[in-house]
């Protein structure tokens, strides 16, 4: 792809100057899939108007379905970020990241650690689903919400079954 940084591939970490991860990955992935999800985007950075984050969520005009992976630990901030994404017509689908195993994320109680905090997990899900439903109704479209989960934080903290049941 002409706008891909030298040496980039579908799994590389994005250079903020190169645009969204999808612009690099889509031309390099030989697959018929029509849905490509962004790399994890922090809800707080979206709500605070961080320019790098806003650049990451701007969809490419060639995308048929715009899907965004959202991360956060505060239900109100997550709901505001989801509402903003729908109102600005930046996504057609929101995927909540409850699967990131990186210690930097799990130490803050996010990613794969969130399903362990069942009440917070359910509050986050409910707040984002409600926000997407309300903003989607105002925009005249339906915004599906999905979740990314892992088996658990580690082998002694398996949460996948409870998380999946809660997310239904």
Locations of the language-model features?
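Glycine-rich, positively charged N-terminal anion/phosphate-binding segment
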Residues: 1-88
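Glycine-rich, aromatic-flanked loop segments that form ligand/cofactor-binding clefts
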Residues: 33-49, 93-94, 114-117, 121, ...
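Conserved radical SAM core fold
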Residues: 41-47, 75, 98-112
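Short glycine-enriched, charge-decorated loop/helix-capping segments at active-site entrances
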Residues: 53-55, 109-115
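Glycine- and other small-residue-rich loops at beta-strand/loop junctions that grip anionic moieties
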Residues: 70, 113, 117, 148
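Alpha/beta enzyme core
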Residues: 79-108, 118-168
């Amino acid at each position: 792809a002409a706008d891909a940084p030298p040496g980039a591939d579908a799994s590389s970490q994005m250079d903020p100057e190169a645009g969204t991860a999808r612009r690099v990955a889509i031309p390099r992935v030989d697959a018929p899939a029509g849905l490509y999800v962004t790399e994890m985007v922090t809800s707080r950075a979206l709500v605070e108007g961080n320019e790098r984050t806003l650049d990451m969520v701007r969809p490419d005009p060639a995308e048929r379905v715009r899907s965004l992976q959202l991360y956060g630990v505060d239900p109100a901030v997550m709901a505001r970020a989801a509402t903003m994404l729908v109102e600005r017509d930046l996504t057609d689908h929101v995927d909540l990241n409850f699967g990131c195993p990186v210690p930097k994320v799990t130490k803050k109680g996010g990613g794969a650690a969130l399903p362990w905090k069942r009440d917070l997990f359910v509050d986050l899900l409910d707040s984002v689903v409600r926000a997407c439903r309300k903003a989607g109704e105002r925009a005249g479209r339906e915004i599906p919400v999905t979740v990314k989960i892992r088996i658990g934080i580690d082998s002694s903290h398996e949460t996948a079954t409870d998380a999946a049941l809660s997310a239904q």
